[in-house]
Amino acid sequence: FVPASEEYTMLSADYSQIELRIMAALSGDPAMCGAFREGRDIHTETAARVYGIPRDQVDAVMRRAAKTVNFGIIYGISAFGLSQRLGCPRGEAATLIENYFTQFPVVKSFMEDLVHKAEQAGYAETLLGRRRMIPEINSANKTIKSAAERTAINTPIQGTAADMIKIAMIHVDKLLKGTRSRLILQIHDELLVDLHRDELDLIPKIEEAMVSALPLPNGVPIL
């Protein structure tokens, strides 16, 4: 995408680590919530915890591994899947996952509760109550049930992120009414705005519209 003309510039506005922030907020895990509230890098924080070292000793390789673990957990990654992504032995990957849940125990309980609730109700829901039916959650087929369990875990997280960006789109669209700038595209957690160069004062207003779209519980900040 390119600006409409030289009078315009392309503005990309996106959420930072939004799914992990939602995981922290919905689970209420004190360690994860605390990291976000204090503005610490969550991947460095996770690396320090799973490797059992001070944050200032975390190197780039450890941080990348922790990032893979952080996002993998949301999708119910297995030790085998993690070992494939990291290129490490399955035993090492299993230890990383075990250490993760030891360091963030409330996340583990939260995920187990999501599966249990889906088994009872037949659906998972977002923070705003939008439901996704998961009839396969009680399947006798282990493979089908495992996939449904992963859906039950990531639906509240991904679904809440989707709710948030949709609300943000509505807010930004209203904000741009009567201006020469326009919202042109949404990609995952990012909004693209064709911004007129005489309207750069809209940037902080767009940021505020996105930040205020859907406040998260447990004091977890959006930025």
Show where each model-derived region lies:
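Conserved catalytic core of nucleotide polymerization and phosphodiester-bond processing enzymes
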Residues: 1-223
